[in-house]
Every structure is written in C-alpha cells, then in structure tokens.
Amino acid sequence: AQQFWDLIIFRIGVGVGEAALGPIALVVLSAYFTREKLPLALGIWGAGPFLGSALAGWGGAAMITNMDAIKPYLGFLSEFSDWRLTFFLFAIPGLIFALLLKFLPFPQIALEKKEKVEFMPFFKKAWKFFLLMFVGVTITGLVGYSVLAWGIEMLVRVHDIPKTIAGQNFGIFNIFLGIGGSIGAGIIASKMIERGIINAHLRIAGIFVILIWVSLLLFTLSTSSFYSQVGLAGMIFFMSCGPGLYGAAFQNASPINLRGRTAAIYYISANVVGFALGPFALGF
C-alpha cells in the first residue's frame, strides 16, 4: 500500500476474511462438540482475540524495538519499513495454521430428510428469540467496542494517566481478564447445562450484561483514576464472557442445516453494527 486508500482497500480485504471466519467457526465447533460442551469450546475459541491482541501489542512493540537485529536474517524483506515487516512476520503463523486446517477431519453429519428445515418457516416461529438476541447483542457490542477503541484515550485525557501506563494496563486487563472471562463463562455454562439447565448460557449472559453496565458507569463517571480502571477491567471481563455464550445460544437454538445462517445473523449484529458503528459514533 502506497496511499491511504490503498491501505483502506487492503484492510477491507482482511476484514472480509475475518468476517467469514466467525460463522464458519461456530458451525464447525458445534459439529465437534455436544450441546453440553459447546459453551466451553466457544469460550476457549473466543479467548483467541484477547490473547492475540495482547501478543500483537507486546510482541509488536518488542519486534519494532529489536528490528535492527532481526533484519539481517530477512533477506530482501529487510528493505521494507519496520511496521510493514511486523505485519508480515505476524501473518506467517496464521498462514501456517490455515494450511493445517486442510488436514483437520470434519465430522460427518447425516441429515434425515425430516430433519431439514427451511429458513423462513423456522424464522417465523423463532423470530422473537432472534430479534431480542439481535437487539441485545447489538447494543452490548456498541458499548463494548466503543470502550475498547477509546478506553485508553479516556484514561489519558480524563485522568492524566501516561499513555504507556494506560496501554500497559489495558493489555494486562485483556490478556488476563479477557481470557479468564471467556473461558470461565464457558466452564460455568457447560456445567449448568450438564445439570439440566438448558438455557444456562442465556442466564449467565443476562447477568453479565447487567454487570457490564455497572462497570461502564464506574469507568465513565468515577473521578478516581483507580476506580475508573477498575470499571474498565470489569467491562473487559464481563464483555469477554459474551461471545461464547451468544454463539452457543444461536447454535443450540437452530436446526443443524441452518446453523450457518443463524451464525451469520449473530455476527452481523455483533460485528457489522457493534464494531463498525460503536467506535465511529463515539468518536463523531
């Protein structure tokens, strides 16, 4: 990319790949795991972005700092600027894992004719569930992604915390609380479903959504930098619990042959609306 618009176009291309991953991953994981184990599986999978963002931040900073020592081993790639090389090197593991997926066996699911359900008749019966989930996930995403995008700046501008300290604390919150919340919520939901509480993921998600708003008020209204960071940490923790629970709810409520479509509905509400409009609306 040589110009701003080149970079935007290529970033959109990356986004297309990211958008395709979510629904496909939900369908694949729901085929591998039972209803009882699915929340935990999706919780572990949902912890990936928190781990990745933390590693990218810390690893990227370390890589750029030591780039002069790395470049002699990169051959012709050493002619590129440091930030481009950082992107290249971090992309290599992703390409390797993508190739390894080719050899991952997919469970064979035989659908009886009577088990196949048309989308519109099913949606007419379950539209209330999907509407409420769509609205809830969208609103939560608008708030959550806005805080993730602007949380550091708020700590810097409102509480005069040095940007390096604010960024470091934000990374620590993500890697420990983000991963812990995502996996922990999955463990709790799976245990509850095993005990016969089939809507456990929705119950837990409902409680955590309330706690997100409590944390949001503490983060935004507190005059103390300490309590504001406590609120931010709470938001990250309770937000991280959602994706695995929401995904499991959509998959468990859908017929097997419609899971891809319902997963797409979930990601439209969570990502397209929440991720695209949330930070933009707050910045505007």
Segments and roles (model prediction):
Residues W5-G13, Y227-G234:
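Paired small-residue
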Residues P39-D68, N174-S182, Y267-P279:
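Glycine-rich segments within core transmembrane alpha-helices of 12-TM secondary carriers
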Residues F106-M133, V158:
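Juxtamembrane intracellular "pre-TM" segments in multi-pass secondary transporters
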